[in-house]
């Protein structure tokens, strides 16, 4: 490893996960099994990917951990919050993502991961009915905490966890359900002082519970990662808090299945200068995520995230002949996304894509993609990579929006107030990721294709 200014990964790394469902328990179980040598963390860039550093005779292909000081899997300590009280072993068994034989070897460790009461507002996830939630006594009745009380309780949770587990650093990862759509409000979400005032005024319309988690994490010196499409940290006020606390933030929405394919396949259409008339995407999903997304207000949040991918790759304003033909009100290609709750499939999501393209002299063609995937199996390595790389970013003194983590995310954060455009092209994202790691490792950035 070259001389680098990145602080070493000394001591334990606490990973506090919001949610103890299918994704979280698959992530935790996989890490615990991998460090016992009983499973391989396939799909994890930090554990498998190699990149070239140097050129010509000096070129070498190195793992990320040979370039920058990443935390070891052996140093990870897990904790979580959830609205359901079942420990991580019980939750993993309930989720039925992994076989019992792949859970039992780490049963004892999983049983020790007991969810702390969640900061929860049922209005933001109506399909969830757990009672392991933070509340207070008022007039002999239990009531939901105010938003500021949520923040203070969560901050205490983070401090207590860090002290009890002897962690030198903590990362907070949202792997819980999608909340209802919260439009960005300039009067509340643009200035940190306004956001704090709204929290203290218990503004439940504009302050989602996830914002309380993010505020608490950043205030306690922990990077925050948004794995759902929630508005949460995608607001200027949170960017200001991240700048103030000098903490990294990353989001939003894990790029696992259909959007991963879309961000990788759309550039093929674009680089070949083929035209696009329409792209229809539909999914069936039966886990708790699918249940929550069956609620229209929650699906709207996901829809906005999934629809944002194509428009920055296949641009109607740049190539009107190719991408300005469609039948929607914006006179561009037709793009629709649907998710259908189908319990028999559980976590085994299936996605269908119908892509109507046209070529020479406008003659039409079609592409069909059918992806039968396992949602949590694809999400788990993203959780690991995002946590390790966010921790790395913090030790490297990188704070605010971590654009180099866009590779892992469906709707990458960007400063839309300044007209910045998100990068959704998978291959461009991969280049940005590799160059950020090269730079943190003391190597020159490199635009050449490996």
Q: Which residue ranges define each predicted feature?
A:
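Short flexible/disordered coil segments
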Residues: 230-245, 284-295, 312-321, 342-349, ...
């Amino acid at each position: 490893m070259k001389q680098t200014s990145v602080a070493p990964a000394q001591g334990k790394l606490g990973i506090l996960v919001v949610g103890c469902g299918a994704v979280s328990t698959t992530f935790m179980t996989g890490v615990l099994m991998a460090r016992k040598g009983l499973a391989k963390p396939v799909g994890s860039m930090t554990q498998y990917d190699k990149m070239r550093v140097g050129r010509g005779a000096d070129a070498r292909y190195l793992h990320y951990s040979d370039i920058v000081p990443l935390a070891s899997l052996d140093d990870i300590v897990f904790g979580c919050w959830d609205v359901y009280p079942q420990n991580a072993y019980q939750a993993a068994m309930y989720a039925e993502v992994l076989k019992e034989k792949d859970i039992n070897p780490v049963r004892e460790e999983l049983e020790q991961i007991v969810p702390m009461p969640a900061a929860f507002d049922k209005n933001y996830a109506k399909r969830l009915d757990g009672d392991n939630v933070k509340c207070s006594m008022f007039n002999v009745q239990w009531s939901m905490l105010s938003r500021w009380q949520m923040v203070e309780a969560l901050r205490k949770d983070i401090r207590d966890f860090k002290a009890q587990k002897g962690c030198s650093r903590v990362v907070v990862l949202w792997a819980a359900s999608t909340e209802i759509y919260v439009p960005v409000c300039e009067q509340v979400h643009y200035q940190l002082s306004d956001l704090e005032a709204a929290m203290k005024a218990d503004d439940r319309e504009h302050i989602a519970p996830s914002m309380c988690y993010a505020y608490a994490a950043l205030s306690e010196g922990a990077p925050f990662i948004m794995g759902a499409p929630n508005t949460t940290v995608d607001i200027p006020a949170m960017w200001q808090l991240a700048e103030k606390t000098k903490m990294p933030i990353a989001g939003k929405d894990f790029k696992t299945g259909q959007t991963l394919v879309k961000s990788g396949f759309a550039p093929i259409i674009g680089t070949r200068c083929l035209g696009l008339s329409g792209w229809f995407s539909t999914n069936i999903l039966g886990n708790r995520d699918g249940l929550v997304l069956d609620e229209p207000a929650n699906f709207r949040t996901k829809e906005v995230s999934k629809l944002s991918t194509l428009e920055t790759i296949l641009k109607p304003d740049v190539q009107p002949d190719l991408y300005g033909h469609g039948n929607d009100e914006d006179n561009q290609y037709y793009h629709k996304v649907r998710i259908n709750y189908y319990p028999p499939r559980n976590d085994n999501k299936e996605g269908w894509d119908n892509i109507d393209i046209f070529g020479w002299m406008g003659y039409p063609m079609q592409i069909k993609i059918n992806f039968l995937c396992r949602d949590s199996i694809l999400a788990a390595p993203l959780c690991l990579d995002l946590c390790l790389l966010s921790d790395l970013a913090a030790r490297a003194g990188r704070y605010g929006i971590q654009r180099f983590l866009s590779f892992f995310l469906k709707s990458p954060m960007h400063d839309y107030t300044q007209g910045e455009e998100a990068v959704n092209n998978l291959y461009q994202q991969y280049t940005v990721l590799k160059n950020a790691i090269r730079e943190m490792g003391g190597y020159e950035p490199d635009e050449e294709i490996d």
